[in-house]
């Protein structure tokens, strides 16, 4: 039932004229990577409230602002965005700010209570990667390449 609701939500999002991708991702230049200090939003961009977008792979990062592991994963996220922005839809979910309904659905369905949490969905919404903790960029790039070649 939950999977069906998410798929329906994704279909509606695909056909909705209000479906925009987060764009212009920027890493907060004041991040202290060695501490759990609260340095503000780790990643900023336009339409930061976007959620899943059907039709291409999706990379989702769920993080907290005061987590040094999240800060390091945020840096990797922006590097991946710079390389794959035209091929992959990026979703950034900051647990310290209000979320859109689309983002809240992703948190409810996939977030396991540990940050950072990284999720990669294929173009149809099927999870290809769904883990908490830091993940190296090459692991995600391999998943992107496999998904993009299908």
Q: What residues fall within each predicted segment?
A:
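Typically the conserved alpha-helix immediately C-terminal to a functionally engaged Cys/Sec
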Residues: 71-83
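N-terminal "domain-start" segment that seeds a small globular fold
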Residues: 20-48
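N-terminal signal peptide c-region/cleavage motif recognized by signal peptidases
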Residues: 16-18
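Short active-site neighborhood of thiol/selenol oxidoreductases, capturing the structured segment around
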Residues: 53-65
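Thiol-based oxidoreductase modules, predominantly thioredoxin-like and allied folds used
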Residues: 86-101
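Bacterial N-terminal signal peptides that target proteins for export
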Residues: 1-8
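Structural micro-motif
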Residues: 110-119
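Non-catalytic, surface beta->alpha helical segment in thiol-disulfide oxidoreductase systems
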Residues: 122-150
């Amino acid at each position: 039932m939950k999977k069906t609701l998410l798929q329906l939500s994704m279909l509606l999002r695909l056909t909705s004229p209000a479906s925009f991708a987060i764009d212009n991702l920027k890493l907060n230049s004041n991040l202290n990577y060695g501490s759990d200090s609260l340095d503000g939003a780790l990643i900023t961009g336009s339409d930061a409230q976007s959620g899943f977008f059907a039709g291409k792979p999706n990379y989702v990062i769920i993080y907290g602002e005061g987590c040094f592991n999240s800060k390091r994963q945020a840096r990797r996220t922006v590097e991946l965005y710079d390389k794959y922005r035209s091929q992959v839809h990026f979703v950034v979910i900051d647990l310290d700010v209000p979320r859109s309904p689309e983002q809240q659905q992703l948190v409810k369905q996939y977030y396991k209570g540990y940050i950072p949490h990284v999720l990669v969905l294929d173009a149809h919404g099927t999870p290809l990667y769904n883990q908490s903790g830091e993940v190296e960029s090459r692991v995600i790039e391999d998943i992107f390449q496999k998904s993009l070649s299908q």
